[in-house]
Amino acid sequence: LCLPSGLIWLTFWSTPLRWGGIGFVVAGLLFGLSNVRPDVIVSRDGRAIAVRGADGLLTIAGLGASDFVVRQWLLADGDLRKPDDPLIRRNGFCDPTGSVVRLASGQRVALALRTRALIEDCRKADLVVTPLAKPNNCRADAIDGIMLRQTGALELFADGKGYRIKASRPIGYDAPWAKNRLIKSPSAYDAD
C-alpha cells in the first residue's frame, strides 16, 4: 500500500510537495524486502505441504494438494509457475503412504498419510506432518491432525532451534465458516 501511494503522490503533485511521496516509496520498498517467506507450508487438512528448497523455490508434496491450493501458495510466494509444472514436485520423494522433502538446511520434512509411514518417519525425519494423531513416542517435531483441527493451515519458519509457527486460524477462533473438523482415525486412512 505504501509503494503505490508514494507513486501516486509523486505523479499527481506538481509542487515541491511531490517529493514527500519518496518517503512512501522507500517505506514500501523496505517493507517488501523485510517480508520473510515461510520454510514450510502445511495445508489445513495435513495432506499436502510445500517446502522451500536450497534454490529458494517451493516443492509441493502430498496427494491432497489441489491445483487451487498450489496456485494460492505459489502466488503468495511470488512464484509464477503453474500448478501442473512438473518441476514443482521435483525435490520430493512420494508414494501413496507419504512424501519426504529436504529443506534448504538439509533437514528432512516428512508427510505421513498412513500409520505405517508415520511410525517410520517419526524415527527418521526432523519434522513430520500428518493428518493423523501423532504417536507419543515420536522423536521428530510433529504437526498432526489434532493441532491442524485447531489452527487450520500453517506456515513454519525455521529459526535454528525449531520452528516459529503462524496459524491461519488462531487457537480458540471459531466462526460458522471455519468450524473444527473431525480428524479421521488412522484406520480410515489405511483403508484408502
What is each of the regions a protein language model found here?
Residues 52-192:
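Extracytosolic and intramembrane catalytic regions of membrane-associated proteins
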Residues 1-54:
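Transmembrane helix-bundle segments that form internal channels/tunnels in multi-pass membrane proteins
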